[in-house]
């Protein structure tokens, strides 16, 4: 810069005039400003690039975390469904066994009643025996129907509870 100023300066001496010195200082300040602005521009680009990369990284991390959470929820739902299914099977099996026991009990009771009626046949006339048989059979049949309906309602309740859990 000094040489440029000297070339413009028309002094014969090596020392510059005040105008040339001021001009050189202005040029230096301008160059320094350009340099500082360029440095700031580069720093801004670098910071923006870093922020962009960080944002991208954070988004990828959030995406992976979301996938992981969704997978975990899916697995948990599957486990719960399997558990409910197993519980329903177990309850249905229990109800089936209970129904079978009740039916066998009703069958035994019917046999017992029939045996008692048969024992009384010898002592009573035929019409009375017929009425006793009819009454005993009717009671046993009604009891069997009542137990079957009760079991049927119980199984329906279990199925409804299973559906509600899902």
From Swiss-Prot:
Entry coiled-coil feature ranges: none
Sequence repeats: 31-41, 42-52, 53-63, 64-74, 75-85, 86-96, 97-107, 108-118
Keywords of this entry: Repeat
8 X 11 AA approximate tandem repeats of D-K-T-K-E-T-A-G/E-S-A-K as annotated region, ranges: 31-118
Top-level taxon in the UniProt lineage: Eukaryota
Stretch list, region Disordered: 1-144
Composition skew (Basic and acidic residues), residue ranges: 1-13, 21-112, 119-137
Family the UniProt entry places it in: Belongs to the LEA type 1 family.
Name this polypeptide is given: Uncharacterized protein ECU03_1610
Organism: Encephalitozoon cuniculi (strain GB-M1) (Microsporidian parasite)
Classification lineage: Eukaryota, Fungi, Fungi incertae sedis, Microsporidia, Unikaryonidae
